């Protein structure tokens, strides 16, 4: 089990921030425009302290029928993951989805979304939901291209953190 858990831990230390979305709610519909940064920057997501927490978190998924982890392997290397749980609102909540940087653009993220859809339908859920930040332009565009729609924007979720300029964007894919 521990080897599987270690396979699950993908170190996505740095994420390139090239721009952000500017969501707009009008006539009961969310739209967004893109703003590209003149100077992209790197954001760190995980440090060494998180490894132990991540292993413990993964163990919660074993033999839990309301949670699942899918790992994507290529050439015997774990290059992608998605963590899902059954949410109270009859959606499958994507807690984490990641593809190693060198393997992006090869359809792995789409494959992880597709297996998530299959799991949610098998659980008789009504769709997928997830949260990301407005300044994760690459992820926002990916979710939009997969058919997700913005359901809400939370301006206070990250207010007590160092990067308190970020807004939480909640995305939904209904079926």
Which residues does each PLM region occupy?
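Acetyl-CoA-dependent GNAT
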Residues: 7-91, 95, 100-101, 113-114, ...
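Preference for well-ordered, secondary-structure-rich cores of eukaryotic proteins
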Residues: 15, 72, 104, 110-111, ...
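Conserved acetyl-CoA-binding loop-helix of GNAT-fold acetyltransferases
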Residues: 99, 105-122, 141-145
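C-terminal "cap" of GNAT-fold acetyltransferases
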Residues: 126, 133-140, 146-149, 156-175
């Amino acid at each position: 089990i521990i080897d599987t858990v270690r396979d699950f831990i993908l170190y996505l230390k740095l994420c390139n921030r090239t721009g952000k979305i500017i969501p707009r709610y009008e006539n009961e519909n969310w739209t967004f425009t893109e703003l590209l940064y003149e100077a992209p920057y790197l954001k760190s997501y995980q440090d060494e302290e998180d490894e132990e927490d991540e292993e413990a978190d993964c163990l919660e998924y074993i033999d839990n029928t309301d949670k699942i982890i899918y790992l994507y392997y290529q050439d015997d290397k774990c290059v992608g993951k998605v963590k899902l749980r059954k949410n109270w609102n009859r959606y499958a909540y994507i807690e984490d989805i990641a593809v190693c940087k060198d393997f992006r653009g090869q359809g792995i993220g789409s494959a992880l979304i597709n297996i998530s859809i299959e799991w949610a339908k098998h659980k008789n859920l009504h769709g997928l939901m997830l949260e990301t930040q407005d300044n994760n332009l690459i992820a926002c565009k990916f979710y939009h291209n997969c058919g997700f729609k913005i359901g809400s924007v939370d301006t206070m979720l990250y207010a007590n953190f160092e990067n308190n300029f970020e807004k939480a964007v909640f995305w939904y894919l209904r079926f």
